[in-house]
């Protein structure tokens, strides 16, 4: 696909594009001309001379199309608008939807999306859709959550169809960790064809990308690394399993441990009745990075458990890179990165065959939201290219019918 090759290269000449795509130079010239006529591709100067005439460079036109990404969390929500290259151009955040019934929660998200689009001043006709990145389990095709979190009312609620109905835009539901992984790939955070992503917000999840595509499993609920069993005699988890890694390493677990260490909990002003998990965890993470020994001990313990998750992922999929993403990991990124890297170095099965590097997300707390928008773009590039090279020019600017939920 020509558009995707241009996107991946950032800037590329027609000759290079023909070589990388396997399409003849004559066909590339024709396709590029049509893509330029539709405003999707622009010329951006010339490359360095290699002895002959410098080659004209191409890139995607960032302002040709846009996509919205939403991190839909119990304690925090983030909305981003990205251009055709996946670069964020506008952002907003607000408290999560945990206290609200589903209808009100979705309506709140829709109002914030509309407000962001109005503030950004983009032509809504250029907005391809919305990627809704959230926790699971979920039925991605139906656009519904299959969990009683945060309340039983949310189970089976048509989150994506309802949001699409309000916005009048296609809405794609996907796992937050999977979205974060593909977002990192698109933004060039990793230079390897296969890598894993460990994502931590209020819970822990994972995503694996192979050759630019997400590993989906049978129902797109795979790589739930927070629900691997790390203690056969451990307590019950909300997922129905016992001894899950999340019970020992996620923000709720860390907060519980801090409260049990009464001097630390009191010193940080932690309240057992506080439902804002992200804010409470953020206080512990900030204290750990500031050198508080008790707080650092808790964060390092959580990080060692995530190291087990990273070792499991690398051994299962033979990965050479693990990305740490999500708002909770961003809060104490250097500590988590250092500890997880050491665990992987010591324990990965193929450590004598190749090193495994652990890096932090380039998108920080917004990784899942940006990834949600990227998933929309990823699904649309082929549609845009087909429409541009087979349709009359009058159709330019009209988004094609797309997969996903729409009104």
Q: What name fits each language-model region?
A:
Residues 8-9, 187, 201:
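Short helix-capping/turn signature of helix-turn-helix
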Residues 191-249, 397, 401:
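Glycine-rich phosphate-binding loop of actin/hexokinase-like ATP-binding domains
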Residues 134, 200-202, 251, 326-327:
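Short secondary-structure boundary segments
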Residues 43-44, 170-175, 208:
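General beta-strand structural signal in soluble alpha/beta enzymes
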Residues 1-44, 50-54, 59-125, 191, ...:
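ATP-binding/phosphotransfer module of carbohydrate and carboxylate kinases, centering on a glycine-rich
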Residues 49, 137-140, 178-181, 205, ...:
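Short, active-site-adjacent cap segments at secondary-structure transitions
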Residues 83, 140, 209:
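Short, acidic, Ser/Thr-enriched surface-loop or helix-capping motifs
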Residues 88-194, 335-346:
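Glycine-rich phosphate-binding loop and adjoining helix at the ATP-binding site
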